A protein has these predicted regions:
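Alpha-helical propensity feature that highlights long, continuous alpha-helices across diverse contexts
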Residues: 1-94
Length: 94
């Protein structure tokens, strides 16, 4: 397996992920107006799950705007994992 081919596929995987995720987040934007608190009973209660979702949204938006070449190695590894699956599928194809 060529390292250049793997990196080219990894870059493409990132572009595909970014395109889909950007679209999905735009569609879901009306329901993703997350605060840190949620209504519970007669008051507002801190919800750590909402905080985690908010942090994930920030990370995803940053990753969407970041070209593959500028991602961290850990982030690139996620795209490389999918590129490797494509390479295996291509090698197995008749």
């Amino acid at each position: 397996m060529s390292k250049d081919k793997r990196e080219a596929l990894s870059d493409l995987e990132h572009q595909q992920w970014a395109h889909w995720t950007k679209y999905m987040l735009e569609v879901l934007r009306p329901v993703l107006g997350l605060g840190f608190y949620e209504a519970r009973g007669s008051g507002m209660e801190y919800n750590p799950n909402i905080v985690k979702a908010r942090e994930s949204l920030r990370r995803w938006h940053r990753q969407i705007e970041t070209p593959y070449a500028d991602l961290s190695e850990k982030e690139k590894d996620s795209d490389r994992e999918w590129a490797d699956k494509v390479l295996v599928a291509l090698e197995a194809a008749p």
